[in-house]
Amino acid sequence: MEHGGHELAVVVLVLLLLVSATSCTFLEEDVILGTVEEAKVARLGGGGGGGSKGANASTRRADNTCAGVGVGVGGGGGGGGGGGGGGRGRFYLGWKEEIAGMAGRPETAAWLRAVRRRIHERPELAYEEVETSRLVRDELDAMGVGFRHPVARTGVVANIGTGRPPVVALRADMDALPIQEAVEWEHKSKNPGKMHACGHDAHVAMLLGAAKILKAREHHLRGTVRLLFQPAEESGAGAKRMIEGGALEDVEAIFAVHVSHQHPTSVIGSRTGPLLAGCGFFKAVIHGGRRSGDAVLAAASTIISLQSIVSREADPLDSQVVSVAMVNGSDHPAATARAAAAEEEEEFVLGGTFRAFSNASFYQVRRRIEEVITAQARVHGCEAAVDFFENQSFYPPTVNDARMYAHVKAVAGELLGAGSYRDVPPMMGAEDFSFYSQVVPAGFYYIGVRNETLGSVHTGHSPYFMIDEDVLPTGAAFHAAIAERYLANHSPSSSSSSDSDDPDVELEAS
């Protein structure tokens, strides 16, 4: 080609680049605020570049980035002709990169660890979460987030966003367990006989992290995010009291996370429909003696007969549990014999738990437990009284709404990438998040903390329970993304708003 042709080609190429750089339009959420260095840590799960975990900003192409003007982020190379190092370039990064970048900053990760460790050192049982609640309020104050307290004694309810519908809620439980921690580390529980053995300290830290991200992105929220810091999940039905205190007023959907030792760190797991069982407890007192029946024999027959409820009556495709977990005939082995010899009334106590994945099955099992216990007592000439602890709310089954489940799965794929999500089987554990799921569409999901190198392999409620703290930034980012994307998809303006409602913000690199 002649020399003049080279000059003409260069001019045409420059014009094309200018047109490309100025003609791209972006949705209002496709904006990143911050520096180029901050953008480089927009990863929350394996890979090169910034080395943080998660979404890889360098892999985004024509969906939200104009080819030819992107610059490689996190060591992954650039998009189009602008890739690689050297020279100046412009970054058009979307909600994924901004949320991941904010959560992945070293100072954010350090703050999340510090918050979690402060809570872990001072565990508090149900409705005693005074210091934990104060920590939450102090952190929200520092962010400029308004809140309401007390709700359900020690609970905190905060709002971020427009203050108008739609309203989506995120929940974290705050209470610990009456367990003596056996893990020897710098931040071991300083409250004897109490331990965060179920990860609620991590739940609070992740929700506070989400609050910080959402507050920074408040101008992108097309509605309101409500944050529920709830007491008494382990016992006391704190969720029910939060609802009674107005925590779900105007809320149209709610989400919550629970750490899981069954999944690798930062992997999300959930399922549609029943996820966790409804849970109830029973206590039976069998009276015998005085020339009537033998309470011990009646109790033995009762325990055997209770096992037939599930094995002989339950639909094998509708999992149920009846378990006798406690028996007490006397304070001394000879007491029963003495009572029989003296023809005195004797007493035998037994108790346990029952579980099912639907309210119908739950109440059917409850009815049969009472029938079996009272009937077996009569067969042996005894009397029995059954207590189902009516003054304490049983935990209903936790059921994921199909749409909320789909939302969790979609956001996991978008934010964390392929392989970040797993469908999980239903479990016989129970959660008082179920009270929320009976009021509004709900999505409950797990986030993995399993790390065999660290020893994070023990189940919840174990004195050896621990977590991989690398999960904290991912959990905070995922919480924030769940809420922001829900509002983006469900706000009245979501289907009619312009792609350029907000001015674009560009990052420049030299």
Curated annotation (Swiss-Prot):
PANTHER family: IAA-AMINO ACID HYDROLASE ILR1-LIKE 6 (PTHR11014:SF62), PEPTIDASE M20 FAMILY MEMBER (PTHR11014)
One of the GO biological process terms: jasmonic acid metabolic process
Coiled coil: none
Keywords associated with the record: Hydrolase, Signal
Acidic residues bias locations: 499-510
Designated name of the protein: IAA-amino acid hydrolase ILR1-like 6
Organism for this UniProt entry: Oryza sativa subsp. japonica
Domain of life: Eukaryota
